[in-house]
Amino acid sequence: MSLNQVPAGKDLPEDIYVVIEIPANADPIKYEIDKETGSLFVDRFMSTAMFYPCNYGYINNTLSLDGDPVDVLVPTPYPLQPGSVIRCRPVGVLKMTDEAGEDAKLVAVPHSKLTKEYDHVKDVQDLPELLKAQIKHFFEHYKDLETGKWVKVDGWEDAAAAKAEILSSFERAKK
């Protein structure tokens, strides 16, 4: 099955599938899966010497306000392979704006059928403070050395906001 055939989830917005593009702790290379071919492309080499603090991917069959599928960060005990799909539960969203407009990043944890490690995490506030600080710091600075690019982090919102983002982006993609 091609990655573009992966559904958005098992039971939106509570139970989602995230297609991983970049593993946690990866080198500063921005990968993107081409939505038409399902191939993993190098989007760019990041100028800052930073690594992704979580696995990074997207929810298929969604369309966020920036014109791309909804971005999702997935903390896991181990880095995931690019192109893998993980079943998750949304717990929050980091609201941001960049040079292209609004750019929210959802945070979702692995479903309890995969690991019990995140069962206590019901909302972004339940994540470790250090992890939230690392995520925020990464997105505040990962474009610092790229001419004409910038990011403004507006702050964290809860699981309800993440679920609302999933539903609205799913409806937007159907139009």
Curated annotation (Swiss-Prot):
Compartmental location: Cytoplasm
Purpose of the protein: Catalyzes the hydrolysis of inorganic pyrophosphate (PPi) forming two phosphate ions.
EC number of this enzyme: 3.6.1.1
Family: Belongs to the PPase family.
Sequence positions that bind Mg(2+) 1: D66, D71, D103
Keyword Lyase: no
Record keywords: Cytoplasm, Hydrolase, Magnesium, Metal-binding
Stored InterPro entries: Pyrophosphatase (IPR008162), Pyrophosphatase_sf (IPR036649)
CC annotations in GO: cytosol
Binding site for Mg(2+) 2: D71
Tagged with keyword Nucleotide-binding: no
Cofactor(s) this protein requires: Mg(2+)
Superkingdom per UniProt: Bacteria
Signal peptide interval: none
Gene Ontology biological process: phosphate-containing compound metabolic process
Assembly behavior: Homohexamer.
GO molecular function: inorganic diphosphate phosphatase activity; magnesium ion binding
Protein's name according to its UniProt entry: Inorganic pyrophosphatase
Reactions this protein catalyses: diphosphate + H2O = 2 phosphate + H(+)
Protein's organism: Yersinia pestis
Residues holding substrate: K30, R44, Y56, Y142
One family name in Pfam for this protein: Pyrophosphatase
